[in-house]
């Protein structure tokens, strides 16, 4: 590419919704390494982290927090970096252009911009706008704190973390999201994990990493190339481990010799169905301990017991269930207590 061609375009790496948290802690170093390798091989003009770098609002877990800070530090040493404050980065979902988030100390670093207000950025004579999460219905209001509509129309791309009208969130189609005129600039947004174009000028690259076992969303990061009258994007699959769910009975699991193996490319969660006493017994076995050592996530699903229901019905009271609850509480087993509560909630 000639120097003239480089001057007439801007390339951006957009990283959507990483959601660093305790549950994906072991995968974060691999995630970071893959992104840094891509940046080293494919230089860009700047990087945008599209919000929700952390997951738990105002509750901070030390390990994911340290990994997030290190990730930003690694990015900014390579390229100018903009980090949008997502709703999960704020203390709650009602924040409107506030500094009530965990990233304020990072504002003192060079070559990184923490976007908790509307930010304008010019690169190769092209203008970009970056907007943090704001509650649905207030996106245009937020932009107008810095730009008039005439100025907005001169912008090439608006980067956001927002729910827009018509976007799909699983089986739900947004009816409360912000409406964005089709003759306004292109928006590239985080917040919605499903990759999609709800309209011609709104692009959701989707979340960069799978966040839950069984989630079917395709996870990529996007390298964007913006020219005067063109927009191109390359969706890059990081090939992170696939998180899958397998269902079976406690009896099946207790036999051992599962045909599922955790690898660098695939991890499993086992959902075991059975009765409370089966779960309690299984948790004391060598098979259960081995599953945990091999990295399996294990959860239990109580199989309704007709005997318990008939006793409760015949007595015409909750005496039996009261006794059951008391016995479970005396075990001091938090998982067993959780299972008992789930069982009682079934009626």
Swiss-Prot record:
Annotated transmembrane regions: none
EC number: 3.1.-.-
Family annotation (Pfam families): Metallophos
Residues at which a divalent metal cation 1 binds: 52, 211
Record key words, sorted: Hydrolase, Metal-binding
Positions contributing to a divalent metal cation 2 binding: 52, 87
Domain of life: Viruses
Gene3D superfamilies reported in the protein's UniProt record: 3.60.21.10
Record-level Gene Ontology MF annotations: hydrolase activity; metal ion binding
Keyword Ribonucleoprotein set for record: no
Family, per entry: Belongs to the metallophosphoesterase superfamily. IIV-6 244L family.
Protein name: Putative phosphoesterase 078R
Top-level taxonomy: Viruses, Varidnaviria, Bamfordvirae, Nucleocytoviricota, Megaviricetes
